[in-house]
């Protein structure tokens, strides 16, 4: 079977509190699928929406991997059969992985060579703890 790699903003860096808390609630389920999730901590947030299939097919667009994009917003994805585009996006993704942490097979984080940790402030930890409860019944609308 194919390996699925996801590059997402780390919760410590994310600018969308609803998305961050939904990820915290769903993190275990996502990891259990076998996907490798790279939690990005670069200088800027990651805003790329792309799926790469083999070395040719790239799917790019505006779709966010959240419930709001799935059920409420009008989103667009475009499939492009172009090895050159795929190569460019792949290189960007590989670079972003060096600024990321990912869960290893031993359930410990592995850190990219450019990863720099950042702790959540006490206030943000409390805020996220409250939002994690609120997002459960409202998840589809956020």
Model-derived segments and their meaning:
Residues 1-142:
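PLD/PLD-like phosphodiesterase catalytic module centered on the HKD motif
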